[in-house]
UniProtKB/Swiss-Prot annotation:
The chain crosses the membrane at residues 24-44, 77-97, 98-118, 125-145, 214-234, 237-257, 269-289, 299-319, 320-340. GO terms for cellular component: plasma membrane. The gene is rnfD. Belongs to the NqrB/RnfD family. It comes from Pasteurella multocida (strain Pm70). The complex is composed of six subunits: RnfA, RnfB, RnfC, RnfD, RnfE and RnfG. Coiled coil: none annotated. This is Ion-translocating oxidoreductase complex subunit D. The keyword Phosphoprotein applies. It is an enzyme of class 7 (translocase). The lineage of its organism: Bacteria, Pseudomonadati, Pseudomonadota, Gammaproteobacteria, Pasteurellales.
Amino acid sequence: MFKMVSSPHTHSGKLTMRIMLWVILAMLPAMGVQLYYFGFGVLIQAALAISFALCLEGIVTVLRQKPTLFYLSDFSVILTALILAMAIPPYAPYWLILIGTFCAVILGKHVYGGLGQNLFNPAMVGYVVLLISFPLQMTTWLPPIQLLNEPPTLLDAYSLIFTGFSTDGFSLHQFTQSVDAITQATPLDSAKVILKEGVNDNTLLQSPIFEAGFAIGWWQVNLAFLLGGLFLIWKRIIHWQIPVAMLVSFTLLAAITELVASIPYLKTLPHLFSGAMMFGAFFIATDPVTASITPRGKLVFGALVGFLVYIIRFYGNYPDGVAFAVLLGNICVPLIDHYTRPRVSGHRQ
């Protein structure tokens, strides 16, 4: 006896929880590298973000009369919180990650109806709200702890995040007094400011945070994200089209600019391994809910995000641009999918 059911009749077997767990697992090496170079702050930020995100998810599902345990166990809100925690400065004040998590979970996800119905990447919604609202806190980074005379301990990290001072009474700024002043910003921040003042990139690369043309700590973190992303492609958790199209698009434009522009910029390869480039290409832009779903659309979407990152990094006021590029790309997804959907044999589009 056969039972008739509606289509689709096949599925990949990759449940949401399994996919989220694989993505989280692929992020852990990058988190470990960030911990090694930038200290214990990332662990505290992740703990705060995940705890608060789970609380918010639980409250919202209860209010909406949804099965709370079912939604908490899919790990999607944990992934959102982890992405946000790894994107902000490790020693940012505790209230920053709480505000960002609230915006990500409530404004970025549940306002649209929950997982699978959101138009924008939730973590990037939270990040952009923080970047626009609190630019000082969002651009204040400690340099790699290997450059500090006395790196903050775990207790120092906890104290800095919750009080603004270490256990010995030192502020975040005082930890950097032994290092060049520009190291309190990211390498891309520093490049944006210094190059606008007319200083050539060779002078910039003499800063302590650069070694052999690459930003210490940042290229290692990006390399870890790259390896984690390749792992996800190998496991068929994400598709290759979006990250490849994004990186190729940005690389071509940056390389052309490097060759013909009269204004000095960082070289193309350091650009690829600075900021959130690899993080965005493999873990943010590939969000299956907010990215294009057609094969050609994935290429178009990835290329568009790469183009937008290039425009913002080279000509905009923000040094990185990955978050803005992804959100702007999300806006275009319905249009991209409409014009790139496969044609059904025997039918006109």
